[in-house]
Amino acid sequence: MRRSEGFLKTMEYYNKAKTQEFIERTLKADVSESRDKFIDYVLKNSRKEVPSKDLNILDAGCGSGRDTKVFLEKGFSVAAFDASNALCIAASEYTGIEVECSTFMETDYENEFDGIWASASLLHVEKEKLIDTVTHLKKALKKNGIFYASFKKGDFSGIREGRFFQDATKEYLKELFGEKCEMEILELYEDESLLSNGSIQEWVNVIAKKN
């Protein structure tokens, strides 16, 4: 399969140039509010009060393994993958589970997961490929499964700071997950994070359900 320039640059960044810097930065990032929202929806739709091993979470583009580890510690069964070899190795060591080295489209799951967590990962997929990518990942969800994704807020598409980014707006995510990928939008919201350089990064988040 021919890889795009954006994909190759992004993998070079994660595999060679900034691996350790990225890991250290993301391990410090606090996404607990969105993660807790996601967990609440997974439990509600599974009619469970607490996490258990019979609830399966897929961490799609797990990066450092930060959230995979939290899901495991809370009691979920978790599968995780990332396209970066270096991050897969680091995340496997950090989480204690084997992290699969795979792109979104190379995964081969069907009706296996109660939730998919794609925190700041789908933002590396070109806009023209997002419908196919989300539709492919959606197949991994059980009926009524929950899908979370986050993107940097905006309309930018291209190489930024050595990686490809596809930014998004609430309107676009509503169209992508709701109209194009035929999921039920449960929440669509914006939040902010403080970057290491002291600046503020705005994010858009979507939580959707497979019907």
Feature map (PLM): residue ranges:
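Conserved acidic residues
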Residues: 114
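A conserved beta-strand element that flanks and buttresses the S-adenosyl-L-methionine
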Residues: 117
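Active-site charged/polar residues at nucleotide-handling catalytic sites that mediate phosphoryl
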Residues: 111
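Short catalytic micro-motifs in class I SAM-dependent methyltransferases
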Residues: 120-124
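Class I (Rossmann-like) S-adenosyl-L-methionine-dependent methyltransferase catalytic domain
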Residues: 1-108, 125-132, 136, 146-211
